[in-house]
From Swiss-Prot:
Residues 21-188 are lumenal. The chain crosses the membrane at residues 189-209. Residues 210-245 are cytoplasmic. Pfam families: TRAP_alpha (PF03896). The lineage of its organism: Eukaryota, Fungi, Dikarya, Ascomycota, Saccharomycotina. It comes from Candida glabrata (strain ATCC 2001 / BCRC 20586 / JCM 3761 / NBRC 0622 / NRRL Y-65 / CBS 138) (Yeast). One of its GO terms (cellular component) is endoplasmic reticulum membrane. This is Increased recombination centers protein 22. It is a single-pass type I membrane protein.
Length: 245
């Protein structure tokens, strides 16, 4: 009976280890969602984003556009990875949009988007909806567009979901392009930054004032001991006797 109990415990421990290993391996699995390689966690965020965007991706499939972009500030960055920016900086999406339709003409009339937290895929901010000068794309035509995104967020990792506003006949549809993965860090301080230089100036003034105060007020003046005068000895040998004392 004792050996049976030990055997069952060993079997259960083995099953637990296998399940734990499978779960760990699942986190490393890469999947391809609509042309993008993602981890399972990123795929879940992407699908949640599609739902939040109210079917914007489905509209992209209905509108036959090929939408690509690179980052003006980081032209050689791998957009499959998280791109590092500092809080307060601006990221510029440099779009290239190609109309693959053989018959329909589309117009790009605006941009907007959303920002999701990487942690829980919660919508933490929206990109400002901006109207632009209409870009008309005839069949097989290509157009370009720049979309500036201000990084006015707290430090952390985010999914940026840019949207193009596309006019199809008389209806404006929101078309979601590829997700931009952002790693936002706090600003580094430059030694030439005016605020940093002002802090240094204040510190120097404080140190100088403290030294002056201690030297002239707090510390007692040093007493200089006067040396006693030693009378000079005069050689009187050359004087006449009447003048000698």
């Amino acid at each position: 009976m004792k050996f049976l109990h030990i055997g069952l415990m060993t079997l259960m421990a083995g099953v637990s280890n296998v399940l734990a290993q499978e779960e760990a391996n699942a986190e490393d699995v890469m999947v391809n969602i609509e042309g993008q390689d993602m981890t399972m966690e990123e795929a879940e965020a992407y699908m949640a984003a599609k739902e939040k965007m109210g079917g914007a991706q489905q509209q992209r499939e209905m509108i036959n556009l090929q939408v690509n972009y690179d980052l003006l500030e980081e032209p050689f960055a791998d957009l499959q990875d998280f791109i590092v920016f500092e809080v307060g900086e601006t990221a510029t999406l440099n779009y290239t949009i190609h109309n693959l339709d053989q018959e329909e003409t589309y117009s790009i009339v605006g941009v907007s988007g959303a920002v999701l937290s990487e942690v829980d895929q919660r919508n933490v901010a929206n990109l400002t909806e901006t109207n632009i000068t209409e870009i008309v794309l005839a069949p097989n035509a290509t157009g370009t567009l720049r979309h500036k995104i201000d990084m006015n967020l707290t430090e952390g990792r985010y999914y940026i979901l840019p949207l193009l506003h596309v006019k199809d006949k008389n209806e404006v549809k929101r078309v979601m392009s590829n997700t931009f993965k952002l790693d936002l860090i706090n600003q580094s301080i430059s030694i030439f930054d005016p605020s940093f230089l002002s802090i240094i100036a204040v510190l120097i003034a404080l140190v100088g004032g403290t030294v002056y105060l201690y030297s002239n007020v707090v510390a007692p003046p040093k007493k200089i001991k006067k040396k006693e005068a030693i009378p000079a000895k005069i050689d009187e040998s050359w004087l006449p006797d009447v003048h000698k004392k």
